[in-house]
């Protein structure tokens, strides 16, 4: 009998509504989903499909209008502001399309900052920050500030920062959106390598078909609902052909 995997994210009947003037806009319409420890998941769909809203629900950046979101079986909606901040700091690492590095800080300082916020000592934070930057291939750039780094290098710093507090989940919102094709492929490969080495669940919201090659499952969202969920082995898309290679 195969070993049952631990569920790190579970959504039950998640709905999200927004008011547009006097009109109620239903963005998510009852999302039921389970994501296991160590999985690499891509959430894909057209603009306006609800994938970014679902991404924000999973990350504790917003709360559902109805339904429940559980992170490690903790109901996110029941947490107060302090508890939610602790959860986001310790359980979740974030990677953004626009990198969101602090421009006056070095690469090392950007990576150590989440650890300092979490109460890790300065020396331990610096040691781990160096190790993470080495791991993402920036061991020689730790004292460089963001403006001294290329877009791909800045995203590598952002990836190292996301892993700073040894999270259970990495949320990557369009992580290749601001990168050229070659650099985007390098970042995708790095994310998969970190996923495999660290055993962390990676969840991406993306339009990038290159993500299909490394995802364990792809969740297709359309009109606020899960249209289908496909395992990598079941996908028929040949990414090389899509990219014109």
Locate predicted features.
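Residue-level detector of flexible, active-site-proximal loop/helix-junction positions
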Residues: 83, 225, 233
């Amino acid at each position: 009998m195969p070993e049952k995997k631990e569920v790190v994210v579970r959504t039950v009947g998640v709905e999200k509504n927004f008011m547009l003037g006097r009109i109620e806009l239903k963005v998510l319409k009852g999302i039921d989903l389970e994501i296991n420890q160590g999985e690499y998941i891509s959430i894909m769909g057209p603009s306006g499909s609800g994938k970014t809203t679902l991404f924000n629900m999973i990350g504790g950046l917003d709360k559902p209008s109805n339904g429940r979101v559980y992170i490690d079986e903790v109901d996110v909606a029941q947490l107060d502001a302090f508890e939610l901040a602790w959860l986001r700091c310790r359980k979740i690492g974030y990677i953004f399309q626009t990198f969101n590095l602090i421009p006056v800080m070095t690469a090392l300082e950007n990576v150590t900052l989440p650890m300092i916020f979490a109460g890790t000592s300065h020396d331990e934070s610096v040691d781990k920050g160096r190790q993470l930057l080495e791991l993402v291939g920036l061991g020689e750039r730790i004292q460089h500030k963001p403006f001294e780094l290329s877009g791909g290098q800045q995203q590598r710093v952002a990836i190292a920062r996301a892993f700073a507090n040894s999270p259970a989940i990495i949320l990557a919102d369009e992580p290749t959106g601001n990168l050229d094709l070659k650099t985007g492929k390098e970042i995708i490969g790095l994310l998969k390598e970190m996923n495999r080495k660290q055993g962390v669940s990676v969840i991406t919201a993306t339009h990038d078909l290159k993500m299909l090659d490394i995802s364990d499952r792809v969740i297709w969202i359309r009109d606020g609902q899960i249209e289908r969920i496909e395992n990598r082995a079941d996908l028929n898309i040949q990414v090389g052909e899509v990219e014109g290679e």
